[in-house]
Amino acid sequence: MHKSPAKISPLFDPKFTPPYCPNTNCAAHHDSHRFEWFRHASYETRLGHVPRFRCRACGRTFSSSTFKPTYYMKRPYLLEPIARGLVAGSAQRQLARSLSCSHQTVSRLAARLGRHALLYQSRALAGQIRITEPVIYDDFETFAYSQDAALGVGTASGASSFFLYSIEATRHRGPGNLAKRGKPIDPDPFAHGYHNAVERTLDRLLPLVPQGASLTLITDGHPGYLRGVREHPGKERVEHRIFKNPNDRKKGQARSLEARLRDAAHFASDLCHKLIRHSLADHRRETIAHGKRHCGVMERIALFMVWRNFIKHRSERKPGETPAMRLGLTDKPLGWGALLAERLLPSRVPLSESWRHIFERNWVTPELGRNTLHRRVHAT
């Protein structure tokens, strides 16, 4: 039997008040003003006293733990240390050994954290955020399952705030003869489409640009990026600036002016990609901890996204301000306790089609054979 730590932060507040009815079919689910409830007994756990409630509108009962990200968890105290470890470079089996749990527990909670991160970022973008800075778009190249099926993760980073606004995936062929000999990639909504990823990113960013203003988009001029901007319905509102990647220079040769301009323009994006490769174990060079499922890779990058935006300081040399603080979303750096304080439901937070595809794990990795989908009724 697993024993809980000696000191556990209080998970159940005796003064807790339910904010809405968790029943998605109830009229009080979306309209909290119509929500009326009364206490409906309670139960005891080894972690404390848990009060229960009943909705007057639909009669559904629920508890205070229904509104926690640890809902339905037998060991809720594992969620925060696993979140910390995943963005600190720990692989899943290393975390399992450190926390005395199964590696499957770590995998399931990593997926839960990724879904929570997608909802958290979506809620932040649906708020009062407005993009008034240039946005740098570039692909972080990685892979899942095998290197002959490469995965490009398009990142949209704020040039001055370093805020990571969006991530979008693109599955494509990897380099080399192995990829050419392999079986063709099964068609999926994320395959062979750098331009599709750019269009999905613009769909997410353009509504955040103030009315009458344009979005300054900085790229390296990849043909897929050019096509994505050219074919987007809102291309008139996009000011596309191109800083091409310079040719490789010889050893000892000074950087050209073109290279210096490109590095200065892409600094925020390059830094983001370095942090991903440094902080996530599955993206290190020549690692045996590489991701197995494309959805799993995107879930962990989504967790990195909210950590980078709301928890990590914008600069290590000048700490004190996060990217979210620079945009006015928060007034102080958040901790994992604040980020995991509230359970978010997909029925109450708008998700784009591509992010919902990842949330529900509909993106199948055919090489694996069996892919577990996310089909929960009550838990997330």
Locate predicted features.
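Residue-level recognition of single "structural anchor" positions
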Residues: 1-380
